[in-house]
Amino acid sequence: MAKEETIQMQGEILETLPNATFRVKLENGHIVLGHISGKMRMHYIRILPGDKVTVDLTPYDLSRARITFRAK
């Protein structure tokens, strides 16, 4: 079975929460809960409030996202 396509969006980190979780404000104004992807965790990429990030949303739960990239 093929996986469902993810929705990629741009956002900004609003606040840091425990367990590598962040509150992210998307371009369209929605606020979602985001967690760091495994590769970002492996390479110790730090994310701070105010950073611009790319997130992946699944069609199943649009209130949670996976943070896949931090803009420089």
Curated annotation (Swiss-Prot):
One of its GO terms (cellular component) is cytosol. Pfam families: eIF-1a (PF01176). GO terms for molecular function: ribosome binding; rRNA binding; translation initiation factor activity. InterPro entries: NA-bd_OB-fold, RNA-binding_domain_S1_IF1, TIF_IF1. CDD domains: S1_IF1 (cd04451). It is found in: Cytoplasm. Residues 1-72 form the S1-like domain. Keywords: Cytoplasm, Initiation factor, Protein biosynthesis, RNA-binding, rRNA-binding. One of the essential components for the initiation of protein synthesis. Stabilizes the binding of IF-2 and IF-3 on the 30S subunit to which N-formylmethionyl-tRNA(fMet) subsequently binds. Helps modulate mRNA selection, yielding the 30S pre-initiation complex (PIC). Upon addition of the 50S ribosomal subunit IF-1, IF-2 and IF-3 are released leaving the mature 70S translation initiation complex. Component of the 30S ribosomal translation pre-initiation complex which assembles on the 30S ribosome in the order IF-2 and IF-3, IF-1 and N-formylmethionyl-tRNA(fMet); mRNA recruitment can occur at any time during PIC assembly. Belongs to the IF-1 family. This is Translation initiation factor IF-1. It comes from Nitrosospira multiformis (strain ATCC 25196 / NCIMB 11849 / C 71).
